[in-house]
């Protein structure tokens, strides 16, 4: 991980396409199989991909409640606190939406989506936080039917995931994962209902299925590997920064970590501490590969250059740990979420800060936003004009219609003026 100056980094900075195009035929075949054969195909794929025989795809409400009831008290309280903070934050956003009406003639009105599917990753780890960071938003929006899909496990779906489903009042939970679960939510099967929108992170198969099926169903985003970029100075706690970097790297060997500073010595000191801590880090195989191939130390010459580098990266997570972080809040524009100060580490945002941890990756923060209650609402523009207002603007409307040679448009106005 050699240190680069800002210009060197920008000259060589590029992101590979987040998806492997060779997966396209596989995804297409899986989706078609689910569309035609429904539950039978899902059970076959559970056996083929997840090595789990599932006689029943749906997990009963009794099982979901039992998972919550038998959960240890400390975990239960942690999940509950996370839920309450997420809910409060999203309710504040929804309240702002209700205050958007500016006139009685033109305004916006919001309606919840009718049904939403949430993908919760499985595999080697359990992710109750994903349930909280997605289903809570749908609940606050007022979505009528919230459906969770998650890969089957030989010992059953994680009790923590089921407990989070109970807390967020998820309607149905199905043990099916991968591209096949996205197809099931898109088309519907004998057991799994068709939904209007699918959200939640997943592997390349999940991401590609969402891309392939978009248009037939709404989606949140096409997620790439996770990433963090930090701007630090000599007041930063470098031991804490080491674990901010490791925390991101342990997600995926393709996870990207960037550290930017105007102080070259700070970067050298951090490099030494990372090298010292790395051999003993948990999840070494994943972290070490990420650090070796996707970790960057970037020396910026001044404040503006540091911000320019950050905006060019447009990371999923940005962290500012400097003596005076406030100026960065306006200058750093293109990030999924901005974490300010020593006591706002990115990891706190993964779990309990309040905003959703489902954020844009792979530079898409330059044109899109993190998941919020708004993603579970439709926004209708209402136009209800008085005769006086119509009379004031009708001539302009009919003239523009005439200029565009849309004479029936023009006549629609003229007939009301007569």
From Swiss-Prot:
CDD domains: Histidinol_dh (cd06572). One of its GO terms (biological process) is L-histidine biosynthetic process. It is an enzyme of class 1 (oxidoreductase). Keywords: Amino-acid biosynthesis, Histidine biosynthesis, Metal-binding, NAD, Oxidoreductase, Zinc. This is Histidinol dehydrogenase. Pathway: Amino-acid biosynthesis; L-histidine biosynthesis; L-histidine from 5-phospho-alpha-D-ribose 1-diphosphate: step 9/9. The active site is at residues 316-317. Its cofactor is Zn(2+). Its EC number is 1.1.1.23. NAD(+) binds at residues 119, 180, 203. One of its GO terms (cellular component) is cytosol. Belongs to the histidinol dehydrogenase family. The gene is hisD. Zn(2+) binds at residues 248, 251, 350, 409. Pfam families: Histidinol_dh. Substrate binds at residues 226, 248, 251, 317, 350, 404, 409. It catalyses: L-histidinol + 2 NAD(+) + H2O = L-histidine + 2 NADH + 3 H(+).
